[in-house]
Amino acid sequence: MAANVPPSAETLLSGAAAHPPKTAEEIANQYDLLPKLIPYLDRHLVFPLLEFSSGSQEDDKEMIRAKYELLKHTNMTDYVANLWKEINDSDTIPDEFVKKREEVLAKLQHYQEQSAKITELLQDEDVVGNLRSDKVANLKFLEEEHGVTADMVNSLFDYGRFQYSCGSYGNAAELLYQFRVLSTDNDKVASATWGKLASEILTTSWDGAMEEVQKVKDSIETRLFNNPLGQLQNRSWLIHWSLFPFFNYDPARDVLTDLFFSPAYINTIQTSCPWILRYLAAAVITNRNRAHKNSNVYQKQLKDLIRVVRQEGYEYSDPITDFVKALYVDFDFEEAQKKLGEAEDVLRSDFFLVSAADAFVEAARHLISESYCKIHQRIDIKDLSTRLGLNQDEGEKWIVNLIRDTRVDAKIDYKEGTVIMNHPPQSVYQQVIEKTKGAFFRTQVLSAAVAK
């Protein structure tokens, strides 16, 4: 019988003391996605992530070494040499760096001379005015009228790649664009498109980046039509590269959210990179705050998100996805409030999401309060404030604003410290529809689980 005796308060307290709450830094480290993201990014795209991480790392030397290892095989010779000096506490650099710098400058001169004629022609308005959408006809025109050869066209590709390796991303974007206008080599054109996308990202030219995202997407669908594995790999890369404009350029938000939820891409996320659910969840939650957002579209995105988070919970979870699960799958408001606190720590330590942290917390509080108000007739302001992570005064202001902004039928009893919700009675017909919807949704989830 002794085994069935519940633990004493002292035992519970000592157990809690043995497992104190994690600090913000511990939570951030536990859910750091950098090791998962790096394999899907070009080394130049990894660099901004390392720069961001170095701001929160105590071991500067280790981070400098990581940057050195990342960039030592590029042609950013001066920057790499400076990193070497920092690592080795030296004012001088080995001869190999001097030699490599001379080689890089010589190659730049070579590529510049090799491509000088064709780049000059492509800057001539009269020549460009005679170009058409037919690449074969363009090459024939340039060959007959100006002596342009296939090698000259290919030199644009080589020069663009070299400029990219040197960190001259603006020059690289222009050269790769010029190459793509003329080349009929599909593999090189595809490579140039990826290179131009990276260059647009690294120069924060978000309009240009989104144009390249669409071009890469189209290339994946057409060039790799008969190669499902190749499509999966390329879609995985595109998803990761798209994170840069996703949270830095507002017009990209809707386009990329729709892309990620499309059958081919949500399947890629579930199969290859489930950690992207963090970014999809953050995008959907913060979409709630956007005044121009269509309510029906938002509700559909939220339903799709809940479905995927429910399905993939065994494969991937973090405080952001756990918040969605707690609120919309388990209807556990205490757990949702706890996960929201952890989610804020994760967001502020994530390169892509740090700027969205405040918007996420604001939107999440709205979602908690909306869900809570839907299932309660009388709400204690103090209790709801606690669930939102606010003190009573802040909570009261929050609820007043919520009632005003959402125009819900409710009134505040300041004397009792409660909110009284006026839920209109639902017709029997409507109740049957809602229950049927719920049963159908559960059937879909079970079917998907069985199919896996």
UniProtKB/Swiss-Prot annotation:
CDD domains to which the protein is assigned, alphabetical: eIF3E
One Pfam family recorded for the sequence: PCI
Protein location: Cytoplasm
Protein encoded by which gene: int6
Domain of life (superkingdom): Eukaryota
Keyword Mitochondrion: no
Chief location of this protein within or outside the cell: cytoplasm
Name of the protein in question: Eukaryotic translation initiation factor 3 subunit E
Organism from which the protein derives: Aspergillus niger (strain ATCC MYA-4892 / CBS 513.88 / FGSC A1513)
Keyword set, alphabetical order: Cytoplasm, Initiation factor, Protein biosynthesis
Quaternary assembly: Component of the eukaryotic translation initiation factor 3 (eIF-3) complex.
Keyword Cytoplasm applies: yes
